[in-house]
């Protein structure tokens, strides 16, 4: 965590407040069939100059954590979160693809594709 001076208290960390909508936007694109996880990450990395995209970050965090967040949002009535949770469970959690901790999530470890110089070359 990064220590900062807060102007006002709020529940949760500042990083999580920023991170959750970012990864949910990426997940929404994938669940709706717009793009795949690697394409979403590649787009973010090329356009934003980041070292990782939302799916690489999810792998590093571990996929159980976003499932818990999505499940809580779904239970609070968020229909999109319910679809995202269902997809994450079906495609990854139930297949024991939990991210870096199991050696596979959206990427395979120890050498994930997003670390390759070729990964950020635009595809045609």
For the regions a language model picked out, list residue spans one by one.
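NAD(P)-dependent Rossmann-like dehydrogenase/reductase catalytic/cofactor-binding core
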Residues: 1-10, 21, 31-32, 37-124
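Amphipathic, non-transmembrane alpha-helical scaffold segments
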Residues: 15-19
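Catalytic, metal-anchored helix/loop core of enzyme active sites in primary metabolism
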Residues: 27
């Amino acid at each position: 965590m990064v220590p900062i001076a807060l102007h006002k208290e709020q529940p949760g960390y500042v990083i999580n407040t920023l991170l959750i909508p970012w990864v949910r936007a990426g997940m929404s694109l994938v669940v709706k069939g717009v793009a795949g996880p690697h394409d979403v990450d590649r787009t973010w990395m090329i356009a934003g100059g980041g070292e990782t995209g939302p799916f690489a970050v999810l792998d590093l965090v571990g996929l159980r954590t976003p499932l818990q967040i999505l499940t809580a949002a779904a239970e609070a009535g968020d229909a999109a979160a319910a679809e995202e949770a269902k997809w994450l469970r079906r495609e990854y959690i139930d297949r024991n693809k939990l991210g870096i901790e199991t050696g596979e999530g959206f990427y395979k470890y120890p050498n994930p594709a997003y670390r390759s110089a070729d990964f950020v070359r635009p595809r045609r």
